[in-house]
Amino acid sequence: MPPRDSYSYAAPPSAQLHEVDTPQEHDKKELVIGDRAYDVTNFVKRHPGGKIIAYQVGTDATDAYKQFHVRSAKADKMLKSLPSRPVHKGYSPRRADLIADFQEFTKQLEAEGMFEPSLPHVAYRLAEVIAMHVAGAALIWHGYTFAGIAMLGVVQGRCGWLMHEGGHYSLTGNIAFDRAIQVACYGLGCGMSGAWWRNQHNKHHATPQKLQHDVDLDTLPLVAFHERIAAKVKSPAMKAWLSMQAKLFAPVTTLLVALGWQLYLHPRHMLRTKHYDELAMLGIRYGLVGYLAANYGAGYVLACYLLYVQLGAMYIFCNFAVSHTHLPVVEPNEHATWVEYAANHTTNCSPSWWCDWWMSYLNYQIEHHLYPSMPQFRHPKIAPRVKQLFEKHGLHYDVRGYFEAMADTFANLDNVAHAPEKKMQ
């Protein structure tokens, strides 16, 4: 089945939770998990994962719940404590056959051990970022300044990939250990907050490319990935900026985003939420920068630091952008199934040894969205079977060459920037 320019889904409730003509409490918030409807009216505000749970109200949240809480016994205990009732006798979710096959496929993967962590792989990943930091510092020490900064810029991105997997708890399988790895990698390696990232990134996973839900679409004033987002801009200065966004995105916008996160957004979140472990990581990172500035000149060190951040930001943000930003969006009042979000609003980049390493297996973005808690190095093993599942149910399995996907990303930036002009012609 070929891809489409747009998709239409049922508006929530996407599953008929009640018997027809049964009186309902209009302010009650329910969602379905398994064969029960759970009343989350009073739980939404105290949900440990934040308001992401509100995105599932009125829908069958079985797959979302399972994939977000693969390793959390605490979540199951909380779920059992909530008021619930059996779903009515005639209940059937949207795309029931697809959901049933996906859940059966998931059970097969669990039986095969695909969700089990690999400690040797974790050791390799940690050793890699340590070795690359040492190599970058050694290059600079021996006078190869630009080569050393380039190495450190790339490993900054590698820390981003590693913390991403830690934030999904798919490294060691122990939530506390994975969070510790994420805090260290993201704080020391990138100067950012793992707690902030987890809160925001899970919203993206819950509803990728859904307007007013996916935080990855909430990118103004620096960039707009969709015409509907760009249409919000009224300022002539911002319109002028967006008109050049395809040219500015890689060299300038990514740097501004990184600096905004490092110097304002993430430290503010750490202070507000009292994540002192993350603040300690920042203290070590910027203590080292201060030491270097005191001994080698503030201007020189600042210039090197900005180049280092720019290279790392360009590496990671451009690679994140290829997976979704040029694909169709979901309307705010519609809701796709978990599998449809992965199929219709996500693209893979063609596998190869270098692309698998360069994107740290996130070129298998479809598999990652289906199974965010699966160790990412196992995605190549399941990809052919995911494709078969999609083909059986008439879904498009979108795979593009890396450079094709990158070209589509920048073409979309340009099209969005000039959409108002084209409409006037």
UniProtKB/Swiss-Prot annotation:
Its main location: membrane. Coiled coil: none annotated. It catalyses: an (8Z,11Z,14Z)-icosatrienoyl-containing glycerolipid + 2 Fe(II)-[cytochrome b5] + O2 + 2 H(+) = (5Z,8Z,11Z,14Z)-eicosatetraenoyl-containing glycerolipid + 2 Fe(III)-[cytochrome b5] + 2 H2O; an (8Z,11Z,14Z,17Z)-eicosatetraenoyl-containing glycerolipid + 2 Fe(II)-[cytochrome b5] + O2 + 2 H(+) = a (5Z,8Z,11Z,14Z,17Z)-eicosapentaenoyl-containing glycerolipid + 2 Fe(III)-[cytochrome b5] + 2 H2O. One of its GO terms (molecular function) is heme binding. It is found in: Membrane. It is an enzyme of class 1 (oxidoreductase). A motif (Histidine box-2) lies at residues 201-206. It holds the Pfam family Cyt-b5. Keywords: Electron transport, Fatty acid biosynthesis, Fatty acid metabolism, Heme, Iron, Lipid biosynthesis, Lipid metabolism, Membrane, Metal-binding, Oxidoreductase, Transmembrane, Transmembrane helix, Transport. One of its GO terms (biological process) is unsaturated fatty acid biosynthetic process. A motif (Histidine box-1) lies at residues 164-168. The cytochrome b5 heme-binding domain acts as the direct electron donor to the active site of the desaturase, and does not require an external cytochrome. This is Acyl-lipid (8-3)-desaturase. It comes from Rebecca salina. The lineage of its organism: Eukaryota, Haptista, Haptophyta, Pavlovales, Pavlovaceae. The gene is D5Des.
